Amino acid sequence: VASGVLYCYIDGAARGNPGPAGIGVILTDQDGAVLREIARYLGETTNNVAEYRALLAALEEALRRGAEEVIIYSDSELLVRQLLGTYRVRSAHLLPLFRRARELMGRFRRVTVRHIGRERNARADRLANRAIDEKLNT
């Protein structure tokens, strides 16, 4: 990554809660050029687990690419507020994912987490849903 900064748009989707789930991740450079898209089927899980799994996939890919700074965009208010410390992680099945995310976040010089509206995250949402559709239609 030339500038050392990666922009990550993440989304998790589940049909039913729990239900068939997938993640969508888009990594771009500072000019908005897409460096990587990830669409991955997760199996049966909850929407919130899918959101965290999308975050972990983005952070792992950013580390692989040698990014020093990561800016995460998510439409999940729960995920963003938990990462910022304004919501406590009460769910036992989210706690290990939260801890892993914090551990990965600590490897970067800086991580910024921003809440965005669904309309600004439509592309990541499409990837997450495509992963589910491709699995269910095979």
Model-inferred region functions:
Residues 1-49, 59-68:
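RNase H-like nuclease fold core
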Residues 51, 55:
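Short, conserved alpha-helix that lines the donor NDP-sugar binding/gating region
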Residues 10-17, 56-129, 134-136:
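RNase H catalytic domain
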